[in-house]
C-alpha cells in the first residue's frame, strides 16, 4: 500500500489566511512534491509568485491550476522562486520582476533541482479514482479541488462530509 507519509516528504502546511490563494498554494505544493519525488529533497516554493504574477489568474480572488502551471511552464527557467526569496504575504501585490527572469531559482545548495522543469499539466479524467492513484504513484502529489459550502467553515476534525455536495467537475 502506497503512503506518502513513508517518504519523509515534509514541507510546511500553509495557511492561506484571508487571501483566496488555495490554487497557488496547491500548485506550489504539487511542484514541491514532484521535486521531492524526483530528487528526494524537501524544498519550499513560492505560492506568492503565482498570486502576484500569474496574469490569467486573479490573485487573492482565486485562480486555476491549469493557468498556474502554464505560468510556470512559460517562465524562462520553468520553475517557481523559492519561498525564502519570495515569501507568502496573505495579500496580492505587484509582481516582483525578478521572479519573471531566468535563474530566479537559487537552489545553489541543491544543484540537482536546476534539472527540474515544469513543462505543463494535464487534467485527469473526472471521477476516476484509479487515474488519480496512478498519477500519485508515478508523478507525486497532484492538485485537487473541492467546492466549498458554508458547512466547511464549521468543520473542526475528522472526515468532512457535505450532504449538499453535488458530484460535478469544478
What do these predicted regions represent?
Residues 1-170:
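Catalytic-core signature of thiol
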Amino acid at each position: 500500500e502506497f503512503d506518502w507519509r513513508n517518504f519523509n516528504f515534509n514541507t510546511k502546511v500553509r495557511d492561506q489566511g484571508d487571501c483566496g490563494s488555495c490554487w497557488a498554494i496547491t500548485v506550489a505544493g504539487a511542484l514541491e512534491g514532484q521535486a521531492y519525488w524526483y530528487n528526494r529533497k524537501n524544498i519550499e516554493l513560492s505560492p506568492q509568485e503565482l498570486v502576484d504574477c500569474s496574469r490569467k489568474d486573479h490573485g487573492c480572488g482565486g485562480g486555476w491550476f491549469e493557468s498556474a502551471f502554464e505560468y510556470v511552464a512559460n517562465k524562462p527557467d520553468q520553475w517557481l522562486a523559492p519561498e525564502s526569496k519570495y515569501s507568502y504575504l496573505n495579500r496580492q501585490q505587484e509582481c516582483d520582476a525578478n521572479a519573471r527572469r531566468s535563474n530566479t531559482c537559487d537552489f545553489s545548495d541543491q544543484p540537482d533541482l536546476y534539472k527540474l522543469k515544469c513543462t505543463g499539466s494535464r487534467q485527469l479524467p473526472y471521477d476516476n479514482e484509479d487515474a488519480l492513484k496512478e498519477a500519485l504513484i508515478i508523478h507525486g502529489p497532484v492538485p485537487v479541488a473541492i467546492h466549498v459550502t458554508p458547512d466547511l467553515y464549521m468543520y473542526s476534525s475528522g472526515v468532512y462530509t457535505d450532504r449538499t455536495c453535488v458530484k460535478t467537475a469544478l
